[in-house]
Amino acid sequence: MKIENFIPQTYQDTLEQVMLSLDFPWFYHSQTSAYSGNDLATGNVFLDNNTEDKPQFLHIFYENGNPTSNHFGLIQPMIYLLEQKIGKTFSNMFRIKANLLYQDSSYAKDMHNIIHIDTPSIDDSYKSFLYYVNSSDGDTLVYNETVKDKPKCLTIKTKNTPEKGTGLFFDSDVYHCSTPPTNTKARVVINFVLKETQNDFR
């Protein structure tokens, strides 16, 4: 589900200004999705002939049941706004992190970073929400298949070009991946992985 104009313009601008400022801490990671041989065997990641993974920078807001960032308060209201937008509530935050991919003008058009799922759990109650902090190139590819399908190959469902203020909401066991920007200097997203409660309030 694509959600346009997810938050007010002033909130969008604040997030972009803070997260792209010199004061915001980013941490280098050599892969977009760390994996082992076991992850390949279980289907947590999926590699194909078009996989060319690039480094990225991370900022973890929340993990292992606790906030891990002084900036957690900046993004926490987005969870409540998401609940209002989709008419669902969330009982648990699995992980919230930001990813920054920097420009790579040599990156081939049809390539992509590692295809992965956001949680290895087969529990359907886990949901992912990707929020685009800035407008850029570097599409997000979302596939039709889930880890439960145990696919031999994947088919693309949607290609989503990052647009500031827009979000994508989908099941956390759906395969997806990013691509680095080739024309813009940076591509910044916030990735929420949340556990949905059984009953909604619509």
Regions found by a protein language model. Give the residues of each.
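Non-heme Fe(II)/2-oxoglutarate
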Residues: M1-F90
